């Protein structure tokens, strides 16, 4: 709870979350914005114009012919009109699912311009047959797109909350973005820029490059992001740096979980008015629109609790974290989460968190090896995969004490992989 209070306190001191009328920003909704090559208009990239199903809120695109861009208004719809308006708002998104990757907009309501997003990105194949595009690779110090970038980003809606007299409840309101909101955005961006070097030196922000890989190629290819910090917008970097500064060994799991729920990859769930976690499907999927949590909403994540399980009096315990194939010490209990064939590349996903922890971790974690050790990951399917697992479980079996146990975490849709487990674990005495 102290961690959440510290986050809210520092955000309040900066004056970047309150509107001056008693409302605090709960969720900030952002989307990509691109220039249509046919019309020259800047177009927000929105798969749907539905903002909230529960509150019956939609966005409206308001053409501005002078600036050749769209203002975005926010409208509450009455219950009687909602089914029809919801259907219309779903269809009027600029990147509707039915168009399958095509940007669609009509400044005058008559002429519709359609352009493939692949064309806007400048997708092509190089001489070696690799997929490429014209997106600029971000520099390490970039925290927002540069003016000349193909993919811009804009704030298009803010959900505000205000405490009510009824304990534990808050009033909610979705609003269009105002000039005051944009000024607060500018203040956040400039503040982060001014402190970027100091925060990096103190280990409060990631300085790590994204290494090429099956999952990690996606944000590099689809957004031009080159460093892990690029997966976070200025508000998210600010919140992350504050949490990181106040983090202890006990609160580290909650801080890392907060990062999972607050990044440029966090889906805005219009059905539940929630900013979703990134790793709901163990991937690094980029989003055309996403949600950012304000401090009060992010505080819900860092206020989590872990149930302690004290050891019996006189019993000492040591927790070790090593690759199974390198295990050489005796142990009593083992928890292992083996690779899911080729389905989940944990060694790549770990780097999302390693980037935040490797510099200046809490004292209790100083001895940890902050490296994903990709080369050591047992990968693949078939005979090579099974042999790798047999070697790993043989080593675990050889070092387990009498009466010890292994907790195996494994989920997969492949019956063939499940069928291989008896040969990998059961026959090694680990079943």
Cite the ranges covered by each PLM segment.
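Short glycine-dipeptide loop
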Residues: 330, 359-360, 395, 399-406
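Hydrophobic beta-strand segment of the Class I
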Residues: 334-337
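Short, glycine/acidic-enriched loop or turn micro-motifs at the edges of active sites
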Residues: 340
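Residue-level preference for long, well-ordered alpha-helices that form the structural scaffold
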Residues: 381-385
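A short glycine-rich, Lys/Arg-flanked "PGG" loop and its adjoining helix->strand segment in the class I
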Residues: 386-402, 423, 427-428
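Substrate-binding/catalytic lobe of Class I Rossmann-like enzymes that use SAM or dcSAM, i.e.
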Residues: 404-431
């Amino acid at each position: 709870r102290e961690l959440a209070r510290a986050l809210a306190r520092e955000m309040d001191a900066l004056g970047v979350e309150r509107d001056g009328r008693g409302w605090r920003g709960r969720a900030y909704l952002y989307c990509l914005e691109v220039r249509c090559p046919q019309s020259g208009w800047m177009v927000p990239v929105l798969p749907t114009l539905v903002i909230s199903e529960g509150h019956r809120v939609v966005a409206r695109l308001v053409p501005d012919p002078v600036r050749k861009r769209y203002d975005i208004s926010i409208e509450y719809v009455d219950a009687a009109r909602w089914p029809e308006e919801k259907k219309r708002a779903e269809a009027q998104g600029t990147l509707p699912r039915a168009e399958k990757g095509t940007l669609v907009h009509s400044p005058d309501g008559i002429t519709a311009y359609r352009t493939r997003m692949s064309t806007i990105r400048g997708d092509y194949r190089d001489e070696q047959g690799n997929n490429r595009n014209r997106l600029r690779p971000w520099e390490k110090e970039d925290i927002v797109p540069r003016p000349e970038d193909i993919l811009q980003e804009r704030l298009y809606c803010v959900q505000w909350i205000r405490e009510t007299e009824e304990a534990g409840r808050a009033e909610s309101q979705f609003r269009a973005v105002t000039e005051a909101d944009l000024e607060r955005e500018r203040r956040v961006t400039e503040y982060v820029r001014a402190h970027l070097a100091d925060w990096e030196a103190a280990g409060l922000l990631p300085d790590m490059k994204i290494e090429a890989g099956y999952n990690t190629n996606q944000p590099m290819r689809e957004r031009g992001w080159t460093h892990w910090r690029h997966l976070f917008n200025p508000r998210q970097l600010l919140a992350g740096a504050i949490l990181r500064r106040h983090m202890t060994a006990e609160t580290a799991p909650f801080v890392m979980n907060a990062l999972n729920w607050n990044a440029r990859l966090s889906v805005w769930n219009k059905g539940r008015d929630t900013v979703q976690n990134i790793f709901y499907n163990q991937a690094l999927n980029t989003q055309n629109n996403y949600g950012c949590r304000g401090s009060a909403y992010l505080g819900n994540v860092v206020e989590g609790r872990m149930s302690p399980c004290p050891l019996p009096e006189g019993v000492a315990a040591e927790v070790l974290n090593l690759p199974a194939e390198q295990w050489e010490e005796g142990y009593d209990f083992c928890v292992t989460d083996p690779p899911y064939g080729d389905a989940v590349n944990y060694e790549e996903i770990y780097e999302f968190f390693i980037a935040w922890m490797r510099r200046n971790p809490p004292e209790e974690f100083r001895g940890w090896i902050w490296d994903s050790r990709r080369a050591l990951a047992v990968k693949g399917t078939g005979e090579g995969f099974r042999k790798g697992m047999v070697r790993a479980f043989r080593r675990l079996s050889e070092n387990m004490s009498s009466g010890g146990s292994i907790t195996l975490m494994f989920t997969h849709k492949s019956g063939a992989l499940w069928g291989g487990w008896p040969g990998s674990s059961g026959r090694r005495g680990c079943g």
